[in-house]
Amino acid sequence: ATAAAATELAAALPAGTPVWSMQNGISNVDVAQAAAPGLTWLRGMVPYNVAELAPGRLHRGTAGQLAVQAHPGLDAWLPWFNAAGLPLAVHDDLLPVQWGKLLLNLNNAVNALSGLPLREQLLNSDYRHCTAALISETLFLLKQAGIRPARVSAARPGMLPRLLRLPGPLFRLVARRMLRIDAQARSSMADDLARNRLTEIDAIQGEVLRLAQRMNQLAPTNARISQLVRSWSPRSQPLSGRSLRKFLNV
């Protein structure tokens, strides 16, 4: 889909036009650049959750500020984004921010398989342990690769697994900011499974698996949950937290 969209844009835009990819994951810009090298591809990041509650009805359920890679052509547009209520956080290097966001997005698969709204899922200790294991595995790989993910939430990246493994009452107390989520908010992957659409598992867990391969390491927990999402069918039933922990061996 990324390559096809990039090709369509290349046919409609003048050569050299800057285009920001706001998709989840890390490699989308590389895919777009290969498909449409005549355009200037830049990184972007959407920090908040957007759920499709009904056809044409998109619901923003969490807070955050759009982040983009700096480009001289963007400067004149910044006041317009501010006026529209969509201020941009501009970064010379967005890659650490994207990895910081990807760490949070590792929960998307857990949320999708749970069948629950995000807040309800995060209040379940078993589901939190699953997400903590996915993040811990990824943090290890990032350290091996010399990549330092940026802080894009209330907690530092390295603290996320410890925070998620806290007992329920303590988690509610310590993670109050994390739990400021609209009751209707779900992950985009949950929307995809509900509508039997192709998910973005390859752009999230897939990035972790590719990083592991580059580092000659394994990422078994991310591989297992990726397998679960890929094998999902319209007849599949949501997994309880205990069942998911057992499958992931965490």
PLM region descriptions:
Residues 1-57:
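Rossmann-like NAD(P)(H) cofactor-binding subdomain of soluble oxidoreductases
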Residues 1-2, 28, 73, 109, ...:
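Short phosphate-engaging motifs
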Residues 12, 35-40, 57-155:
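Internal alpha-helical scaffold of NAD(P)-dependent oxidoreductase catalytic cores
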Residues 15-19, 63-66, 214:
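Short active-site oxyanion
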Residues 26, 45-50, 72, 94-98, ...:
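Glycine-rich beta-alpha junction loops
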Residues 82, 132, 136-250:
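NAD(P)-dependent Rossmann-like dehydrogenase/reductase catalytic/cofactor-binding core
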